[in-house]
C-alpha cells in the first residue's frame, strides 16, 4: 500500500498519497533488493493463482519457499514424552494443559493431575528437556505464501522438493536464505474476508440491484462508525476479537484513519511499548498533546505524538537520531514479525546517543526508545494497517446496511474468523434477519437469500437505534453445507435433480420434491445420505415431515437401491436395482421432545434455530442463584455477579501477560469474562476444556463494555446431559446459539465433553424404557426406524 504504482495498477485500493504512507517502507535506493510485496487473494481461489504462476513461469522457474517449523510447547512435550515411553493418553493430557501453540510449558499441577509425580527423576528430566528444545528446528515445511520466481532455472541453483499436495513444488530454502541471495519472493496469501466480501457484494447486486466494489462502497458512512463505537463488530474483519471489541468504544473511531489506528493499536508492540494509554488519554483530551521538536511533530502529528507504526519508528530514527535510510531499514528488519521476536535492542545505544547529539533530553530519548522497543514484540506497518482498515470498513458497512447478505456470505466463506456459524446466525437474528433452516426443496450448497420480513421491524433491543440504517428485506436460507457429513457433490445433485427444463424455452424451472420416495428416485441416493438429510431435519417442506418421521420414511425404503447390497431377486432385467418397493404402513410417531430436537440440531448442524440449551437448564441455574447474562446491563460496576453460559471463545493474547478472555452465552445475551493468571493456574482444566461454565466475579464497566472479572469458575458441562429429558415446555422460537460440541460426535453415549449420560446408558440396557419416555436409545430418532425394519 506504500506504492503509487501498485495503487494505479489496482493491486491495492489504498491511496498512498491520501494516507501519507512512507514510500521508503516499500523501496529505497539504499535497499539493494527488490520491493517486498504481499498480495492477498480470496482464500477459496488462492490455488488458482498458484497454478497460474506455475503455468506461466514453469516449475523450473517458480516455486513456493520453505519455512523451518520449530518445536513449541505442545510439540516439545509430545516429542520428549514419546522418546521416554509415555503413553499416548498421558502425552495428550500433558500437552493439552499448554495453551495454544505458544512456547509454554507443563506445570507441576498438570503433571499431578495426570497421576504422575512431578518430583520423580524421570518426570523432571522430561520437563527439562521439553523446555530446552523449545524453539529448536523440527522440520521443513512450505511457507504460508512466499513464492519464488527467477529468470534462470531454479533447479540449477537450489534443491526443489515435491509437496504433499498435488501439483505443488517448493524450494528447500527458507526466506532468509532467499533474501541473502537476492532472489525475488512475493507473498501470495489467502484471506477469507476477501471471499466473504466478494460473496456479500454479489448477493447485494443480485437481490438489491446495487453493484459495489471495494473502491465504490460509500466512504465515511456515519452509521458504520456509530455501529463500531458500540462494539457491534462480530464478523467484521480484524475488529471482532474480544480485545478489539473492548478497544472500539474507548477509541470511538469516526473516520477511516481512526480505523487504521484501531487495527494497529491492539498489537503487542504498542501495548508493550506503553503507547496505548497515552494515545487514548490524548485523544480524549485528558493529556496535553506535545512534541519535543517541529521535525518530530511532522512525524507524529497523525497519532497525537505517540508512535504507533513501524514507519514512524523509522522516521524517528532518521529525524531525531541521525540514522541513514539504510540504517533505518536495518532497524525495520530488527522489528518483530508475526511469531518472530525482533532484535531491536541492539540499536539502543546508537539511537539514544544520536538523539542526545541532536539536542534531545536523555529522559525523552530513553522513553522514546522504550516505545520503539515495543516493536520488538510485533508492531504493525502503517501500510498494512491501511490495507486492513479498508477491509474493516467494507465489512462493517455490509454488516450495518445489509446484515442478511453479510451473514450469508460469512457462512459461505467458513472456516474463517473467530466465530462459528451458530454465533453468526445469532448475531444476524439480533439484527432482525430471519434465518431459515436447510431444506431439501429450498436450499443450495451455499446459504442464500429469500424474500422475507424487513429487518428494521425485528431488531433486538440492543440494536434498535439501527432502525433507519438497515436496508435488509430478505431472509437467510441456510445452505446444505451446514449439514454434517453431506458432500458438496451430493448437495449439487439435489439442486440439479430439482430443476427441470421448461417446455417453452431453454430455461429451467424448479420442481419440488414431494416425498422421501421422490427424493430417493430422482437422486438415487443411498440410505446413508438420506439419513444425513433426515438427521438434519431437512425434509420440513415435504408436508411438514418432522425429523423422526423423515428418518422413519428413509428407513422404510429399506436397502433397495443401495447398489453394493442388492440381491439378484430385487434387480431389474437390465441388472439395475429395482426402484419399486412395497409401501410401508402408515404410523403415528410421538413428537420428539424439543430438548432432543436441540441435541440433534447441534449434532448434525452445529447450531439450533429452535432454542438455546441454557433455556432447558434455567430452573437448575435459578436454584443455584445464577442470573441470566442480560442482567449484567443492570448490575452496577463493582458489584459481584453469578452468571453462566456456553463457552464460545477462549483467547489468551501473548501481549496480555497470561490473562485469558472467555466469551460465554446463555439464552439472553453474551457475556465477557476475564480470568487473571492466578485464577487461570488454579482452575486451568475448567478454563481450557469446560463447555458450559458458571462464573462468579466482579462486574466491570468501561465505555459501555461490560466484563466479569472471575474469581471462581465451576464446570457445569454435565448439565448438558439433561437436555434430552426436557419436553415441549420451552419456547421453540428462541434464538440459536453455539456450543462447540455438546455431544461428542464419535462417542454417542458420551455427552458434553466426556460426561457419561446415565439416562442414555439405561435406555440402551432397557429399550422398553426408551419407548415409554418417547426418546431413542441413542439420544436421537434412529430407534423407531430400526424397530420398523425389525417388525
What are these regions (language model features)?
Residues 1-791:
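Noncatalytic, beta-rich nucleic-acid-contacting surfaces in large DNA/RNA-processing enzymes
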Amino acid at each position: 500500500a506504500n506504492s503509487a504504482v501498485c495503487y494505479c495498477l489496482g493491486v491495492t485500493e489504498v491511496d498512498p498519497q491520501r494516507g501519507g504512507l512512507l514510500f521508503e517502507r516499500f523501496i529505497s535506493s539504499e535497499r539493494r533488493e527488490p520491493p517486498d510485496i504481499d498480495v492477498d487473494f480470496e482464500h477459496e481461489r488462492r490455488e488458482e493463482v498458484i497454478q497460474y504462476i506455475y503455468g506461466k513461469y514453469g516449475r523450473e522457474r517458480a516455486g513456493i519457499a520453505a519455512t523451518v517449523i520449530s518445536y513449541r510447547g505442545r510439540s516439545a512435550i509430545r516429542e520428549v514424552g514419546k522418546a521416554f515411553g509415555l503413553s499416548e493418553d498421558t502425552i495428550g493430557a500433558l500437552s493439552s494443559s499448554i495453551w495454544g501453540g505458544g512456547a509454554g510449558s507443563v506445570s507441576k499441577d498438570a503433571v499431578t493431575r495426570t497421576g504422575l509425580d512431578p518430583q520423580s527423576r524421570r518426570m523432571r528430566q522430561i520437563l527439562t528437556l521439553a523446555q530446552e528444545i523449545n524453539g529448536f528446528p523440527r522440520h521443513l515445511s512450505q511457507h504460508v505464501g512466499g513464492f519464488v520466481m527467477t529468470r534462470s532455472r531454479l533447479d540449477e541453483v537450489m534443491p526443489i522438493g515435491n509437496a504433499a499436495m498435488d501439483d505443488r513444488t517448493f524450494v528447500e530454502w527458507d526466506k532468509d536464505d532467499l533474501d541473502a541471495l537476492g532472489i525475488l519472493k512475493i507473498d501470495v496469501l489467502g484471506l477469507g474476508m476477501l471471499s466473504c466480501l466478494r460473496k456479500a457484494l454479489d448477493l447485494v447486486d443480485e437481490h438489491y440491484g446495487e453493484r459495489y466494489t471495494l473502491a465504490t462502497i460509500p466512504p465515511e458512512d456515519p452509521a458504520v462508525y456509530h455501529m463500531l463505537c458500540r462494539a457491534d463488530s462480530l464478523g467484521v474483519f480484524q475488529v471482532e476479537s474480544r480485545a478489539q471489541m473492548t478497544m472500539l468504544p474507548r477509541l470511538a473511531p469516526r473516520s477511516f484513519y481512526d480505523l487504521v489506528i484501531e487495527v494497529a493499536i491492539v498489537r503487542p508492540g504498542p501495548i508493550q511499548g506503553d503507547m496505548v494509554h497515552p494515545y487514548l488519554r490524548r485523544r480524549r483530551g485528558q493529556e496535553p498533546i506535545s512534541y519535543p521538536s517541529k521535525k518530530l511533530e511532522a512525524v507524529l502529528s497523525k497519532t497525537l505524538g505517540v508512535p504507533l507504526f513501524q514507519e514512524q519508528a523509522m522516521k524517528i530514527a532518521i529525524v531525531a537520531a541521525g540514522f541513514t535510510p539504510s540504517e533505518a531499514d536495518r532497524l525495520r528488519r530488527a522489528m518483530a514479525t508475526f511469531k518472530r521476536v525482533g532484535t531491536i535492542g541492539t540499536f539502543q545505544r546508537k539511537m539514544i546517543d544520536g538523539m542526545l547529539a541532536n539536542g534531545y533530553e536523555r529522559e525523552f530519548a530513553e522513553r522514546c526508545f522504550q516505545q520503539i522497543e515495543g516493536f520488538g514484540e510485533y508492531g504493525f506497518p502503517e501500510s498494512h494497517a491501511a490495507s486492513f482498515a479498508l477491509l474493516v470498513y467494507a465489512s462493517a458497512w455490509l454488516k450495518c446496511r445489509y446484515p442478511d447478505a453479510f451473514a450469508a456470505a460469512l457462512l459461505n466463506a467458513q472456516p474463517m474468523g473467530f466465530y462459528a456459524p451458530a454465533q453468526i446466525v445469532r448475531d444476524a437474528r439480533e439484527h432482525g434477519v430471519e434465518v431459515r433452516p436447510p431444506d431439501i426443496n429450498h436450499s443450495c450448497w451455499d446459504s442464500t437469500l429469500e424474500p422475507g420480513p424487513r429487518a428494521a421491524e425485528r431488531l433486538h433491543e440492543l440494536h434498535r437505534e439501527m432502525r433507519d440504517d438497515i436496508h435488509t428485506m430478505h431472509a437467510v436460507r441456510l445452505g446444505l453445507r451446514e449439514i454434517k457429513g453431506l458432500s458438496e457433490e451430493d448437495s449439487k445433485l439435489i439442486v440439479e435433480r430439482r430443476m427441470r427444463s421448461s417446455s417453452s424455452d431453454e430455461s429451467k424451472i424448479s420442481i419440488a420434491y414431494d416425498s422421501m420416495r421422490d427424493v430417493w428416485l430422482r437422486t438415487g441416493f443411498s440410505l446413508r445420505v438420506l439419513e444425513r438429510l433426515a438427521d438434519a431435519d431437512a425434509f420440513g417442506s415435504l408436508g411438514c415431515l418432522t425429523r423422526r418421521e423423515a428418518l422413519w420414511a428413509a428407513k422404510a425404503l429399506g436397502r433397495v437401491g443401495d447398489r453394493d447390497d442388492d440381491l439378484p431377486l430385487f434387480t431389474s432385467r437390465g441388472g439395475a436395482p429395482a426402484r419399486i418397493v412395497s409401501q410401508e404402513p402408515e404410523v403415528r410417531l410421538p413428537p420428539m421432545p424439543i430438548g432432543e430436537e436441540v441435541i440433534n440440531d447441534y449434532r448434525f448442524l452445529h447450531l439450533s434455530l429452535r432454542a438455546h440449551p441454557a433455556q432447558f437448564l434455567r430452573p437448575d441455574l435459578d436454584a443455584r442463584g445464577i442470573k441470566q447474562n442480560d442482567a449484567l446491563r443492570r448490575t452496577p460496576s463493582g458489584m459481584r455477579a453469578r452468571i453462566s453460559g456456553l463457552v464460545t471463545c477462549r483467547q489468551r493474547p501473548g501481549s496480555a501477560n497470561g490473562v485469558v478472555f472467555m466469551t460465554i452465552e446463555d439464552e439472553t445475551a453474551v457475556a465477557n469474562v476475564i480470568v487473571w493468571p492466578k485464577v487461570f493456574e488454579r482452575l486451568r482444566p475448567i478454563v481450557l476444556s469446560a463447555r458450559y461454565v458458571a462464573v462468579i466475579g466482579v462486574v466491570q464497566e468501561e465505555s459501555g463494555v461490560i466484563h466479569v472479572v472471575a474469581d471462581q469458575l465451576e464446570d457445569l458441562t454435565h448439565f448438558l446431559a439433561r437436555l434430552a429429558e426436557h419436553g415441549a415446555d420451552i419456547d421453540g422460537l428462541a434464538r440459536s446459539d453455539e456450543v462447540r460440541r455438546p455431544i461428542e460426535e464419535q462417542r454417542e453415549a458420551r455427552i458434553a465433553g466426556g460426561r457419561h449420560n446415565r439416562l442414555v446408558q439405561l435406555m440402551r440396557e432397557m429399550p422398553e424404557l426408551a419407548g415409554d419416555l418417547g426418546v431413542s436409545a441413542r439420544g436421537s430418532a434412529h430407534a423407531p426406524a430400526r424397530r420398523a425394519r425389525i417388525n
